[in-house]
Amino acid sequence: MAVVARVVLNGITKEQYDAVREETGWLKEPPVGGLSHMTWWEGEDCHNADAWESEEAFNAFGAERLGPAMAKLGIQAELQVTFHPAHEVYLPQPVTLTV
């Protein structure tokens, strides 16, 4: 079942986020089961809204790629994750926009 993952990383900077994105290579090799990913900041906290094929796919990406990348870069941000069953995931066209 598809899920929406709401993720908060307290205190991670935009530079750290960009370094993690580069280290994991998720733009070149999208995570298995990842459907969409959006990121924004509120104050010093990084927020993400993702659509995934399943919680298991999200957790596998975290264990196999995200966690190791953060550890390698010395980033110690705790992920606060809540999952919600997706009623609909609509992606009219593939697009990647980065600032």
Could you say what each language-model-derived stretch is?
Residues M1-A49, E53-G67, G74-V99:
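Short S/T/G/P-rich N-terminal loop/turn motif that feeds into the first structured element of a domain
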